[in-house]
C-alpha cells in the first residue's frame, strides 16, 4: 500500500533484496549483530550434539568459510567456492530439513533447485554423517512447528537465536553472524512505490522472521 518507508533486516538478505529491486539503498549505519543457528526439537539432544560436532569440524577444515565466501564474499570470491557433494556411503538414514526458500543468500530457488548457504551447510553435515539430505520447503512460520512435531529433523532458514524461540526448540551452535542494516527508498531513483512496499511485506514482515 506504499506505507513502508524503511525496514531493518540482516545485511546479506538486504544486499540481495536491493540488488533485485531498483529504487532502494542500504544506509551505512550498522546495528546489532545477530547469531544464526539451526533449530532442532527439544528432547533430541543427540542430534544437537551430532550437528554441533560436525559444524566444529567443518569450521576447522575451512568448509564453512568457503561456503560463506561463495555467496557473500568479495566480487572475486562469489561463485568461486561451490560446495561439492562428497561421494560417501549414506547408510545412516535421511536428514529432513525444513526451510523457507525465500531468503537469499541463505536459501532460495535457482534453476528449480533450493540452494544457498544453509542448504550447502546441511549438505556438508549430511556428507559428514553419512546421511541423505531431504529438503522440505514451507512457510517460514511453519518451520519451527514442523521441527517440534517431528515432521522435519532440523530447521535451516536463517533463524536468529532468540529467547522466545528457545522456549520451543533447541538451537545448534552459531554458524554465522549478521549485522542488521536499514533499507530505505533511494530518492535519486524512480521506482514504483506500491510494488516495493508489497515486496517488503512479503519478504520481511509477513513471516515475522525477526521475532
Predicted segments with their positions:
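Hydrophobic residues within well-ordered alpha-helices
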Residues: 1, 10, 38, 51, ...
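A conserved helix-loop-strand patch within extracytoplasmic ligand-binding domains
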Residues: 1, 43-45, 131, 160, ...
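A ligand-binding cleft/hinge motif common to bilobed small-molecule-binding domains
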Residues: 4-32, 142-145, 157-168
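Short, Asp-centered acidic motifs that coordinate Mg2+ and/or phosphate
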Residues: 5-6, 25, 37, 96, ...
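Short amphipathic alpha-helical coupling segments at ligand-binding clamshell hinges
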Residues: 10, 43-57, 63, 117, ...
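Periplasmic-binding protein-like
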Residues: 11, 15-52, 75-88, 101, ...
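Ligand-binding clefts/hinges and TM-proximal coupling segments of bilobed small-molecule sensing domains
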Residues: 22, 26-30, 53-92, 195-208
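Extracytoplasmic small-molecule ligand-binding "clamshell" domains
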Residues: 50, 66, 90-161, 166-167
Amino acid at each position: 500500500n506504499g506505507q513502508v518507508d524503511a525496514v531493518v533486516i540482516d545485511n546479506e538478505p538486504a544486499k540481495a533484496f536491493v540488488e533485485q529491486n531498483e529504487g532502494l539503498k542500504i544506509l551505512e549505519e550498522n546495528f546489532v549483530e545477530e547469531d544464526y543457528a539451526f533449530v532442532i526439537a527439544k528432547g533430541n539432544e543427540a542430534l544437537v550434539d551430532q550437528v554441533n560436532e560436525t559444524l566444529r569440524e567443518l569450521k576447522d577444515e575451512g568448509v564453512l568459510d568457503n561456503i560463506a565466501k561463495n555467496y557473500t564474499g568479495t566480487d572475486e570470491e562469489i561463485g568461486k567456492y561451490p560446495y561439492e557433494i562428497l561421494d560417501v556411503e549414506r547408510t545412516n538414514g535421511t536428514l529432513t530439513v525444513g526451510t523457507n526458500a525465500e531468503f537469499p543468500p541463505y536459501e532460495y530457488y535457482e534453476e528449480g533447485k533450493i540452494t544457498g548457504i544453509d542448504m550447502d551447510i546441511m549438505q556438508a553435515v549430511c556428507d559428514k554423517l553419512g546421511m541423505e539430505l531431504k529438503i522440505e520447503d514451507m512457510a517460514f512460520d511453519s518451520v519451527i512447528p514442523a521441527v517440534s512435531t517431528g515432521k522435519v529433523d532440523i530447521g535451516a532458514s536463517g533463524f536468529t537465536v532468540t529467547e522466545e524461540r528457545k522456549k520451543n526448540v533447541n538451537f545448534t551452535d552459531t554458524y554465522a553472524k549478521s549485522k542488521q542494516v536499514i533499507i530505505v527508498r533511494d530518492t535519486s531513483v524512480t521506482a514504483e512505490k506500491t510494488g516495493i512496499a508489497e515486496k517488503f511485506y512479503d519478504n520481511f514482515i509477513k513471516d515475522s522472521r525477526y521475532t
